[in-house]
């Protein structure tokens, strides 16, 4: 499990570095404005939160991860990396 966590963290770090370098390159080419970078990141985070909330509505092993009308996962379920995980 620790290996999976380490791989996930390293993958995220590489993706962030790649995203920042690509954004800097586009900024240098005057394709995007510097303030647009942060707007895009905020939108991405909102999309991920939505995906995470949506995935918790999916039933795992016949049990709902999140009760109807609830905003958070319940019953020992947690939403991690767009998956319902039982803790």
Curated annotation (Swiss-Prot):
The keyword Transcription does not apply. Keywords: Disulfide bond, Ion channel impairing toxin, Knottin, Secreted, Signal, Toxin. One of its GO terms (cellular component) is extracellular region. Pfam families: Toxin_20. Its main location: secreted. It is found in: Secreted. Expressed by the venom gland. Disulfide bonds join 52-65, 56-79, 73-84. Residues 24-48 form a propeptide. One of its GO terms (molecular function) is toxin activity. Residues 1-23 form the signal peptide. InterPro entries: Hwtx-2-like. Probable ion channel inhibitor. Belongs to the neurotoxin 12 (Hwtx-2) family. 03 (juruin) subfamily. This is U3-theraphotoxin-Cg1b. The lineage of its organism: Eukaryota, Metazoa, Ecdysozoa, Arthropoda, Chelicerata.
